[in-house]
Design a protein with these regions (language model features):
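Predominantly a Rossmann-like dinucleotide-binding segment in NAD(P)-dependent oxidoreductases
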Residues: 123-193, 201
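Active-site loop of classical SDR/Rossmann-like NAD(P)-dependent oxidoreductases
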Residues: 269-281, 297
Length: 324
């Protein structure tokens, strides 16, 4: 059983803790927050053995094997390095870092130290991903030519979205999901990536649209928003029909339609704890096999997603303070 630690005690950490508590392959061992009382309350609520008032104390605990990083993505780079320097395997929330340079550095560092480091982009690990792959491969919609995907939440008032010093904006927080959806369906070998964004007064993107063009002529048309609520749908268009994915952020079902727009097949999502369990199980498997990356989200894919977002931000003139 892998002893897990969590860095950060916010909303996403609570979801992970509630998930870990229901799993047999890991144990809820330690949690750290910048405030000890908060960490202690978290530990009591979710059944963790240890609570720490600093991240440094948690990584110094030799019992901790795998650390889940649930801090704002502006801090992922330093927290990944902190964990790796203390010999911990790492599952880090998305966005993995703020740019490709940071990602490349910590991934190289993990390989050098012989430690697992992987990005917690949960959609990559879910079983419905294989279901979607199988449906497309069956040829039921013929040759796919285009996909659309969107993700929008009413989150513009949240600190992590508003503030440039926290690497805020819609792109890194929610735009990463449509981008990953496109990469999972059509691959990550793109010929061209372009985008348009509306920036806030503080200089981060409130909402955006992104277009990927592939060497074989396929296109992915994507958008994300922190100010508008979207239907979260992904649609893949073929020459014999189309596929609708209900909620690209946590698949709630897949529906297949023919050329007359008649429903021909549907697939339900299997019962899950929260959906977070799949990325944790992937880490447990990788650690058990002595692997340094998870096949569900290889390092090269994490680097490509960061590269895409770097290019989009370059087009928008969106630079974070820590990059200047």
């Amino acid at each position: 059983m892998i002893k897990t630690g969590i860095i950060g005690a916010g909303r996403i950490a609570k979801t992970m803790a509630a998930t870990l508590r229901e799993m047999d392959s890991v144990s809820c061992y330690a949690v750290a927050a910048r405030d000890y009382d908060r960490a202690e309350a978290f530990a009591k609520k979710y059944g963790f053995c240890k609570a720490y008032g600093s991240y440094e104390e948690l990584v110094q605990d030799e019992e901790v094997q795998l650390v889940y990083i649930a801090t704002p993505h502006s801090h992922h780079y330093e927290h990944i390095k902190l964990c790796l320097n203390h010999g911990k395997h790492v599952l880090c929330e998305k966005s993995f870092t703020i740019n490709e340079g940071q990602a490349a550095e910590v991934l190289a560092m993990a390989k050098e130290k012989g430690l697992l480091l992987t990005e917690a982009i949960w959609t990559r690990y879910m079983p419905m991903r294989k279901t979607l792959d199988d449906v497309i491969a069956s040829g039921i919609i013929g040759k796919p030519h285009m996909l659309t995907a969107n993700l929008g939440y009413l989150i513009s008032g949240k600190e992590r979205i508003m503030r440039p010093e926290l690497a805020g904006g819609a792109l890194l927080d929610v735009g990463i999901y449509p981008l990953n959806f496109a990469a999972m369906v059509f691959g990550s070998d793109v010929k061209e990536i372009t985008g348009t964004a509306v920036l806030t007064e503080l200089g981060v993107d409130a909402q955006n649209s992104m277009t990927l063009v592939y060497p074989d002529g396929k296109m992915a048309v994507l958008n994300s928003s922190s100010v508008g609520l979207s239907d979260r749908r992904g649609v893949i268009y073929g020459d014999k029909g189309y596929i609708e994915v209900e909620n690209i952020n946590n698949c709630e079902g897949i529906r297949v339609y023919d050329v007359n727009r008649n429903l021909t097949a549907s697939y339900e999502t299997p019962k899950q704890i929260s959906g977070y369990e799949y990325e944790v199980e992937a880490c447990v498997r990788a650690i058990g096999n002595g692997e340094l990356e998870c096949p569900e989200m290889p390092h090269e894919e994490t680097l490509k997603m960061m590269r895409w977002m770097d290019e989009l931000r370059r087009q928008w003139g969106m630079v974070f303070p820590m990059e200047e």
